[in-house]
Amino acid sequence: TVKAQDVALKTNLLGWATTSLNAGVEIGTAEKQTVQLFATINPWKFSGDKKVRFWNVEPEYRWWTCQRFGGSFFGLHALAGEYNIKNVDLPFGLLPKTKRGRHYEGWYIGAGVTYGYQWLMSRHWNMEASLGVGYAYSPYKLYGRCARCLDKNHRNYVGPTKAALSMIYIF
């Protein structure tokens, strides 16, 4: 049965800073173990013909060094999603630089390792910082004006796969 300190709801404040809607749930599975499922979506089109639309799901297993929902943890995460990006250059070489009027559509799947720390703020509220690095495979299509496909290619990405500063409510 699920008891107190076994379930947490969370949101990544860094995601909100980029206008990305996001939420996650984390469930205690043992004294020092939790599993988390996190989802993010950004459905917006911005001014100046810029677009960064995507969705992402990220399951993660966590092992806590002391007790769950407090202190340091190490994790293994997976990630998968789709994107549609126009007139925006992404950091870390995620995609080749875009020229005006061109956009990328594709999907990705990957995995990585995480380190994080969770601070106890009050009986029900915590704050968490985490960073993950890993690998992602991403096939994509590059489109030009009038939706003409200019290129089909893929990226093998190695680098940061996760960054979070999360506000957490623990039941």
Regions found by a protein language model. Name each.
Residues 9-16:
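Short strand-turn segments of transmembrane beta-barrel domains in outer membranes
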Residues 19-22:
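Short, surface-exposed coil-to-beta transition loops
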Residues 27-129, 164-169:
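Gram-negative (and chloroplast) outer-membrane scaffold detector with strong preference
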Residues 122-171:
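Predominantly the C-terminal beta-signal and adjacent terminal strand-loop region
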